[in-house]
Amino acid sequence: MNDSAHIDYARYDHIRPLLWTGDALELLDQRKLPFEVAHVRCDSSDAVAEAIHSLAVRGAPAIGIAAGWGVVLAARDIAADDGSAALQKLEPALLRLNAARPTAVNLAWALMRMRRVLGAAGADWREVIAREAQAIADEDLAANRHMGALGAALIAPGSGVLTHCNTGSLATAGFGTALGVIRAGMAQQRIAKVFAGETRPWLQGARLTVWELQQDGIDATLIADSAASHLMKSGLVQWVIVGADRICANGDTANKIGTYQLAIAARHHGVKFMVVAPSSTVDMATASGDQIEIEQRDPGELFGVGGVRTVADGIHAWNPVFDVTPGDLIDAIVTERGVIAQPDLARMQAAFGA
């Protein structure tokens, strides 16, 4: 039942947020969804960095993929006889890309892959980095489809699920992480009902997740973030399924702000909590969530909705955009390498090494 062959990908996997045209990176502008489908054309690495920072492209896997193509674009501006020489000249562009969003480990991971292959490349270094950027995207899509099947297998038929933020095709190379599990669960008739939190302040759940599910013909119910505990108490959901921007060696998980409170509420109400992310999101070099840098964005993002100010002048705001869920509140971490139940340091080391 958990075989991915049971999934109609023509129906459940047709949205693509990134397209490499051969001379530019085209990004589906997620700031304008769902009412306008527009694209941002990036002709330089700086344009890619700005698109990442401004949330034109978002989602940990997607920004890693975008950064890979950003390196390819940066390479056009330099001359070098081999990869090692090119790497020295490209380092400023790599640093600018890495600084675009600090919390998601996939960004640094993708850039490290590009550094590694570049340093070992010869005269064909331009072709080498283009192949590596494409490989990062291809591997992410394959991982997402596999994780979808693994995660769906944990869900009893007839279950209701709640998700947070956007973890679908828009956040990845395709299919999605947590939303990939939901897509697979719907395709296999394991999931009976899907709820999505609106996800203030950027409303990724309201603007993106329910739109994605609508494109697939999946009926989803939007809730206010503050309604989640009441929903769990009602008995309508058996799983909370979320993505991740960084998973630490002990299982602590950084994800969109609001995830931590969902995990606390889920544990109180006996609702299971699943984190779905590719192994590139796992950071075994970070011992615990206390060591994660949490991105703080402009407080002005909290002052209004849809460009309309709703807050009086002179009000202060605090706007962290990620929080850390302790590993002991997580029932399962699903990666393409398998399922880690009740994650802790020993189980994480067994799956990913020290």
Swiss-Prot record:
UniProt record similarity statement: Belongs to the eIF-2B alpha/beta/delta subunits family. MtnA subfamily.
Pathway noted in the entry: Amino-acid biosynthesis; L-methionine biosynthesis via salvage pathway; L-methionine from S-methyl-5-thio-alpha-D-ribose 1-phosphate: step 1/6
Alphabetized UniProt keyword annotations: Amino-acid biosynthesis, Isomerase, Methionine biosynthesis
Enzyme class: isomerase
Gene3D superfamilies for the chain: translation initiation factor eif-2b, domain 1, Translation initiation factor eif-2b, domain 2
InterPro entries: IF-2B-related, IF-M1Pi, IF_2B-like_C, Initiation_fac_2B_a/b/d, M1Pi_N, NagB/RpiA_transferase-like
Protein name as it appears in the record: Methylthioribose-1-phosphate isomerase
GO biological process: L-methionine salvage from methylthioadenosine
GO MF: S-methyl-5-thioribose-1-phosphate isomerase activity
Catalytic activity: 5-(methylsulfanyl)-alpha-D-ribose 1-phosphate = 5-(methylsulfanyl)-D-ribulose 1-phosphate
UniProt KW Protein biosynthesis keyword: no
Enzyme Commission identifier(s): 5.3.1.23
Residues that coordinate or bind substrate: 58-60, 101, 204, 255-256
Record site feature (Transition state stabilizer), residues: 165
Free-text function comment from the UniProt entry: Catalyzes the interconversion of methylthioribose-1-phosphate (MTR-1-P) into methylthioribulose-1-phosphate (MTRu-1-P).
